[in-house]
Amino acid sequence: MKKIILATSNKNKIIEFKKILSELNINTISQKDLGICSIEENKSTFLENALIKARNASKYGFPALSDDSGLIIKTLNGEPGVYSSRFSGNQSNDIKNINMVLKKMLPFKKMDRQACMHCVLIYIRNPNDPIPIISSGTIYGKISNSISKINFGFGYDSIFFLPKKKKTISELTLEEKIKISHRGIAMKKMIKFLKNEKY
């Protein structure tokens, strides 16, 4: 059975990855289980950050799959973007980050609240792999005025409103979320690559 390191320490992302990859004959191992420390995400794009995370994890003898994703808000000129997980500072967490977004969006309560969530996935066979497999996914919605009382998600899910669904991402079940989310879209593309990979 093929082994892949999941280059993330985010337990919620690991749950989603394992759920989506369950259809493949792949043994997924989180980097935490191997004692791999997270690497600093100091690049300016999701692609670059995903690449350094994948290269770091793949040093430990197995191919690695990494994710870098975030929230992009039109009226905030793309914020929080690559800083999504640490938008509220060094001691950030989901609640602090959400409150920071809602605070910054207060002046735009009746204006354009369009946003998107974007995910970049990279599969790398070894640290020197010159042809990593890359996939991405984007979902569009709006920033709600308050936090949803129903929260099955994580990150910014509880304030990311989906007009077609008339609910936030956090109100979806895991199965529903995987079908339409930015990460789910990127993973479906990645699975096609992994199924047909010959190198």
Swiss-Prot record:
Active site (record annotation): 68 (proton acceptor)
Could you give the cofactor binding note from the entry?
Answer: Binds 1 Mg(2+) ion per subunit.
Query: What Pfam families does the database record attribute to this sequence?
Result: Ham1p_like
The EC number(s) given in the record are 3.6.1.66
This entry's Gene Ontology molecular function terms read:
dITP diphosphatase activity; ITP diphosphatase activity; metal ion binding; nucleotide binding; ribonucleoside triphosphate phosphatase activity; XTP diphosphatase activity
Report if keyword Hydrolase is assigned: yes
Describe the reaction catalysed, as an equation: XTP + H2O = XMP + diphosphate + H(+); dITP + H2O = dIMP + diphosphate + H(+); ITP + H2O = IMP + diphosphate + H(+)
Q: Which cofactor does it need?
A: Mg(2+)
Q: Which BP terms from GO are recorded?
A: nucleotide metabolic process; purine nucleoside triphosphate catabolic process
Q: Does the keyword Magnesium feature in the UniProt annotation?
A: yes
Q: Where does Mg(2+) bind?
A: 40, 68
Q: Which domain of life is it from?
A: Bacteria
Alphabetically list the UniProt keywords: Hydrolase, Magnesium, Metal-binding, Nucleotide metabolism, Nucleotide-binding
Which residues are in coiled coils?
none
What would be one Gene Ontology cellular-component term for the protein?
Answer: cytosol
The UniProt annotation places substrate binding at: 8-13, 69, 154-157, 177, 182-183
Tell me the PANTHER family matching this sequence: INOSINE TRIPHOSPHATE PYROPHOSPHATASE, INOSINE TRIPHOSPHATE PYROPHOSPHATASE/HAM1 PROTEIN
Oligomeric state and partners?
Answer: Homodimer.
Similarity section: Belongs to the HAM1 NTPase family.
**Function summary:** Pyrophosphatase that catalyzes the hydrolysis of nucleoside triphosphates to their monophosphate derivatives, with a high preference for the non-canonical purine nucleotides XTP (xanthosine triphosphate), dITP (deoxyinosine triphosphate) and ITP. Seems to function as a house-cleaning enzyme that removes non-canonical purine nucleotides from the nucleotide pool, thus preventing their incorporation into DNA/RNA and avoiding chromosomal lesions.
Q: What is this protein called?
A: dITP/XTP pyrophosphatase
Question: What is the protein's species of origin?
Answer: Wigglesworthia glossinidia brevipalpis
